[in-house]
């Protein structure tokens, strides 16, 4: 299956491209959801949505394409879908994982780890990892964050899709 990408900007200035490898063989429903949301038009997927929460030394969160503040988003299967499995772990920086509000509440929100986060294992479904753009793009995004998660600039997915 194809890898996915985000072209990210900070306050309208291009930061670069992040490329994700997705674990289709381990969590096919979860990766199908993410891949389709990368291909959908603005308002129906990730294109033109923002990263609403960035906490340095922890993670970068996005995927709320309906409200833009962490309260919304929806999966291609309906509002929410189940935790597929927890086979993959948060073992390093650059892991791509589903954000949720408890068991079996996956929608469209996701996060990228910027360190090991083993306390999230068994609670959040890891479905991919960053394979390009970590040092240039993800690190620059992390620098805009704060302990509260509020960002000092608008981090936007200008374009996204599959490669």
From Swiss-Prot:
It is an enzyme of class 5 (isomerase). It catalyses: [protein]-peptidylproline (omega=180) = [protein]-peptidylproline (omega=0). The keyword Hydrolase does not apply. GO terms for biological process: protein folding. InterPro entries: Cyclophilin-like_dom_sf (IPR029000), Cyclophilin-type_PPIase (IPR024936), Cyclophilin-type_PPIase_CS (IPR020892), Cyclophilin-type_PPIase_dom (IPR002130). GO terms for cellular component: cytoplasm. Residues 5-162 form the PPIase cyclophilin-type domain. Binds cyclosporin A (CsA). CsA mediates some of its effects via an inhibitory action on PPIase. Disulfide bonds: none annotated. One of its GO terms (molecular function) is cyclosporin A binding. Belongs to the cyclophilin-type PPIase family. PPIase A subfamily. This is Peptidyl-prolyl cis-trans isomerase. It comes from Uromyces fabae (Rust fungus).
């Amino acid at each position: 299956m194809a890898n996915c990408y985000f072209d990210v900007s900070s306050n309208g200035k291009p930061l670069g491209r992040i490329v994700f490898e997705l674990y289709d063989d381990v969590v096919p429903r979860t990766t199908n959801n993410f891949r389709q949301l990368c291909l959908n038009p603005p308002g129906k997927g990730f294109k033109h949505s923002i990263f609403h929460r960035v906490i340095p030394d922890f993670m970068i969160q996005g995927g709320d394409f309906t409200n833009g503040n962490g309260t919304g988003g929806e999966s291609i299967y309906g509002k929410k879908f189940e935790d597929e499995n927890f086979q993959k772990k948060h073992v390093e920086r650059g892991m791509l994982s589903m954000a949720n509000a408890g068991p079996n509440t996956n929608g469209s929100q996701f996060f990228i780890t910027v360190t090991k986060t083993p306390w999230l294992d068994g609670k959040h479904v890891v479905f991919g990892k960053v394979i390009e753009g970590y040092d240039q793009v993800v690190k620059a995004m992390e620098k805009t964050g704060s302990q509260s998660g509020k960002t000092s600039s608008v981090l936007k997915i200008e374009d996204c899709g599959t490669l």
